Regions:
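Bacterial N-terminal signal peptides that target proteins for export
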Residues: 1-9
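Bacterial N-terminal signal peptides
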Residues: 9-16
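Serine/threonine-rich, low-complexity intrinsically disordered segments
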Residues: 10, 21-22
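N-terminal amphipathic/hydrophobic interface segments
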Residues: 22-252
Length: 252
């Protein structure tokens, strides 16, 4: 049995939650379905063990989310779940988190997912090895490399990233690489909106196409309409000439 409760606590501290979160009324995690139920105080003094049967997975609900898995350890007194094997956490019709292993705290609404993690929303899929998700803030965070695929056209790699679910926006940091069929963008920080495909970058940024190289330190690029606006030390190098300026509008 894994122990990531301390990781959840660390996540809590790192995101600087206010005490008002804990003053809110807490709802209990509910076990909707389990094929087998085991309660052994000697083997698992604080937990009930829930296991799927041949036909259906374990089903768990809490305040607008549904979780399914092959097996779960339910710590009722702590309002806490450890889920194992083909884990899925669904929030409404817009967000689905899949992993090999997941922890969920019903009091703080914090989620930790690990192993083949996929975060799906209508416009994109994020792939990483571990992910924290704060349901109060509707923010998810990873720090062990991630890959985002949007509409099979835009692919973004980075070492760190944060997803803001309410804005449908990702903030990618460190070794950011946005790839499309027509160009690549390399930047330190890139804000990317999954609905529109618009990307906003800051810091030294290179945009490479088949016939040009663009450099700037601030700006945006619209991946849907293939145009952009570049500010601060902007430069476009074509094969036969170069354009420099404080601000450059670019439309292919």
């Amino acid at each position: 049995m894994k122990k990531h409760i301390l990781l959840i606590s660390g996540f809590l501290l790192s995101f600087c939650f206010s005490t008002t979160i804990f003053a809110q009324e807490k709802t209990k995690i509910k076990i909707e379905r389990a094929g087998f139920f085991e309660k052994d105080k000697n083997k698992y003094p604080d937990a009930s063990v829930l296991t799927r049967d041949k036909e259906q997975k374990v089903l768990i609900s809490h305040d607008g989310v549904l979780m399914t898995c092959n097996q779960a350890f339910f710590y009722e007194e702590k309002n806490f779940i450890e889920a194992f094997g083909e884990v899925s956490l669904k929030q409404g019709d817009t967000l689905n988190l899949k992993a090999n292993y997941l922890e969920y705290n019903g009091d703080t609404k914090l989620v930790y997912a690990e192993g083949n993690v996929i975060l799906n929303e209508p416009e994109s899929n994020l792939y990483t090895e571990s992910l924290y998700f704060d349901r109060n803030k509707q923010e998810a965070f990873y720090s062990e490399k991630g890959k985002l695929i949007r509409n099979l056209s835009d692919t973004i790699y980075s070492l760190k990233g944060t997803f803001f679910a309410n804005e449908k926006k990702y903030r990618f940091e460190t070794n950011v690489d946005l790839r499309t069929p027509k160009y690549n963008i390399y930047s330190d920080i890139l804000n990317y909106f999954t609905e529109s495909g618009k990307s906003y970058f800051s810091g030294p940024t290179d945009i490479i196409t088949d016939d040009s190289k663009i450099y700037c330190e601030f700006g945006y690029y619209d991946t849907m309409n293939d145009n952009g606006y570049f500010i601060k030390n902007s430069e476009i190098d074509f094969e036969e000439y170069q354009i420099n300026g404080d601000s450059i509008y670019f439309d292919r």
